UniProtKB/Swiss-Prot annotation:
Mg(2+) binds at E259. Its EC number is 6.1.1.20. Keywords: Aminoacyl-tRNA synthetase, ATP-binding, Cytoplasm, Ligase, Magnesium, Metal-binding, Nucleotide-binding, Protein biosynthesis. This is Phenylalanine--tRNA ligase alpha subunit. Belongs to the class-II aminoacyl-tRNA synthetase family. Phe-tRNA synthetase alpha subunit type 1 subfamily. The lineage of its organism: Bacteria, Pseudomonadati, Pseudomonadota, Alphaproteobacteria, Rickettsiales. Coiled coil: none annotated. One of its GO terms (cellular component) is cytoplasm. It comes from Rickettsia typhi (strain ATCC VR-144 / Wilmington). Pfam families: Phe_tRNA-synt_N, tRNA-synt_2d. It comes from the Bacteria. It catalyses: tRNA(Phe) + L-phenylalanine + ATP = L-phenylalanyl-tRNA(Phe) + AMP + diphosphate + H(+). It is found in: Cytoplasm. Tetramer of two alpha and two beta subunits.
């Protein structure tokens, strides 16, 4: 009995002085482990002949074991609380320290320009249509009245991909006119929408990049004529540049998908040079035929513009390639604040 009380007192003294969980675990093994002090006492049962003595001794050993276990358990709780308090003290936040400056992102000039262009067309009742970047030869060329030997179909102008769709070559769309074809095939006239998005051509210099952004517009209805086209283009240009005095001229041109076709030039002031900004024309009858629209009942006009071109003119950016270089200094100079998004109520932005 005296030996059991001595073991309990020794355990209490040692565990009381422990300051970390690692040392506590070592004492647990020392007293309750396979070769520990309490286990060694328990082995003495085999030397006792009297059954009653064995029973009483076994009960005392088990009681000792439970007491030491409870002491260790209580110490574990104390040490864990101490560790948590130390961690909280080390991690506490000083509310008097000035906060780090919040870094807010900004709007890329192409995104800003795209938003402004869309808002202008929204004033004229245009909706938005979207389509895939990967197209087949039919939607990108054939349905738009491109001849099979047209230079635009060549590898040096178009990015062709491996694989085919409905036995037609796959490619990265070279214009968003593909969206017009899909929309006309899947819907019924009248139509009045724009198709903004990325386009791809094998070209790279100061005025061309392999990937660029376009907005193409389409209007299909009864009794549509060139006068409607000119009205929309003139109103659009003057609204976007916020200059009612911009001069415009329509030059005869050629596009496979429009007839007659024109290119539009502008100049801000009388002494400025004329600058080409977009192409347009009346939708070619073959295009209407290819999408199942009655050419004798419906007519329409289409136009297409490069978003980068309009951004360069409006924001006075000289080199097209700078849009895609990721130069932080350049982006900080030409960026737009997130609250500087155009809206119909507040008008256009800088």
């Amino acid at each position: 009995m005296a030996n059991i009380e001595t073991i309990l007192k020794l355990a209490e003294e040692k565990i009381l002085l422990v300051h970390n969980l690692k040392d506590l675990q070592e004492y647990k093994v020392e007293f309750l482990g396979k070769n520990g002090i309490v286990t060694s006492e328990l082995k003495k049962l085999s030397s006792l002949v009297n059954g009653q003595e064995r029973k009483e001794f076994g009960l005392k050993i088990n009681t000792l074991k439970d007491k030491i276990h409870n002491i260790i358990k209580a110490k574990v709780q104390i040490l864990e609380e101490e560790e948590l308090n130390l961690k909280l003290a080390a991690d506490k936040i000083d509310l008097t320290i000035p906060a780090r400056r919040y870094k807010q992102g900004s709007i890329h000039p192409i995104t800003q320009c795209m938003d402004e262009l869309i808002q202008v067309f929204a004033q004229f009742g245009f909706t938005i249509e979207n389509g895939p970047n990967i197209e087949n030869d039919f939607h990108n060329f054939t349905a738009l009245n491109f001849e099979y030997d047209h230079p635009a179909r060549q590898m040096h102008d178009t990015f062709y991909l491996k694989g085919r769709e409905n036995d037609k070559p796959l490619l990265l769309r070279t214009h968003t006119s593909t969206v017009q074809i899909r929309a006309m095939k899947n819907g019924k006239p009248p139509f009045r929408f724009i198709a903004p998005g990325r386009t791809y051509r094998s070209d790279s210099d100061m005025t061309h990049t392999p990937m660029f952004h376009q907005i193409e517009g389409l209007v299909i209805d009864k009794n549509i004529n060139m006068g409607h086209l000119k009205y929309v283009i003139i109103k659009f240009i003057r609204s976007f540049f916020e200059n009612p005095n911009i001069e415009l001229r329509f030059r005869p041109s050629f596009f496979p998908f429009t007839e007659p076709s024109a290119e539009v030039d502008i100049r801000m002031n009388k002494n400025d040079k004329w600058l080409e900004v977009l192409g347009c024309g009346m939708v070619h009858p073959n295009v209407l035929k290819n999408v199942g629209i009655d050419r004798s009942e419906y007519q329409g006009f289409a136009f297409g513009l490069g978003v980068e071109r309009f951004a360069m003119l409006k924001y006075n950016i000289k080199d097209l390639r700078r849009f895609f270089e990721g130069d932080i200094r350049w982006l900080k100079h030409y960026n737009f604040e997130s609250f500087d998004i155009p809206n119909l109520a507040g008008g256009l932005t800088k």
